[in-house]
Amino acid sequence: MRMEKTTDKSLSAGDMNDEYSRGPIDDIDCLNFFERAVQDPCCEACDTEDADEELRAKLSSFNFQPDSSPCNAKCQQTLNPLCKIDEALSAESELAPSRNGSVSEANSDTNSIASTVHDPVDSKYGGMPSLRKAKTTSYFASSSSNNTTMRNPLKKCNTNINGLLVNGRSSSSSRQSIPELFSGACTKKKNNVLLKSETPNSEFSSNSLQHCNSRSFSLPRSRSRSSAIAIPTHLYGLEKYVSPGLDTLTADPEESIERFSNNRPREISSCCPNDTGDTSSSLSHSNTSSSLNFPLGTNTNQFHQPRQPVQQQQSSKPNFGAGRKKSFIEMSLASSFAG
């Protein structure tokens, strides 16, 4: 038994590795013929296999060698965390400008460094592009287009201001011209009524008419004219056309009716004609006109009343409220006032 153990121990490590490695290699070759889901559906590596292949391809194409520029070497020395402190300080002192040197040289050095150093956010590293620095130059530095862009709004403002001034002047002149025109045209008033005997003055000539026409077109539409000019003067004298009998009727209707009945027969007797032909013709005309108002099938004779003398008919007309029957409304009102 001891000899067998020694023979097992006498096998080299390489032979053992070859024996154990042949089995799994053959198994992998066999599994490659099947689909991915058939191999191991619960394996997480199946889902990330494509991403791993993309990362491997990027790493294979990535250039790990730094640039050959001396500036990059200096920057990498300062950024290297394994470098010594003295070396980093010496590199910073080399980058800083000397006291005797000018500021422009230092600025040019920093600009050249910024232009030559590779951007860590470059697209080839898989990052987003960096933002650009804002321009510090003046807005109206060179081209004439900027001047034109500034002049156009200035012109618009000037035109608007001029238009407002012209409108204000025209409105003020029109306001002043209205009383000047009507001072010569309007005559004197007495109790807000024009006097017929008076005539307008001679100042209202053709020149003033032309002036009025020219000013009337310049008036803006939105402005309303004064009410005193728009209303004619004869409207103020309408009170003289109102008869005083209306006031008496509203005050005491019974007395006014009696006065009207007493005064009416005298006027009729003075105005009635002597000829009977005219009266008969007028009566026949009234009968025909009244018969026309009725329908054709009805008998109009029953509506006709016997003829009476003209004077009696005319004298009975003023007493229109004497023999009339009172309505229910009048009786109810009278009873309510009496109680």
UniProtKB/Swiss-Prot annotation:
What positions are modified (Phosphothreonine)? T159
- Coiled-coil ranges per the record? none
Ranges of Polar residues composition bias in the record: 99-115, 198-213
* Entry-linked InterPro entries: Mbr1 (IPR031443)
Does Amino-acid biosynthesis appear among the keywords? no
Name one cellular component (GO) term: mitochondrion
TM helices/strands, residue ranges: none
Q: Which domain of life is it from?
A: Eukaryota
UniProt entry keywords in alphabetical sequence: Mitochondrion, Phosphoprotein, Stress response
Q: Name one Pfam family in it.
A: MBR1
Modified residues annotated as Phosphoserine in this record? S177, S224, S227
Give the compositionally biased regions (Low complexity).
214-224, 279-293, 302-314
Q: Does the keyword Thylakoid apply?
A: no
Q: Where in or outside the cell? A: Mitochondrion
Chain positions covered by the region annotation Disordered? 1-20, 94-130, 198-224, 258-325
Family designation? Belongs to the ISF1/MBR1 family.
Q: What does this protein do?
A: Participates in mitochondrial biogenesis and stress response.
Protein name in the entry: Mitochondrial biogenesis regulation protein 1
The organism is Saccharomyces cerevisiae (strain YJM789)
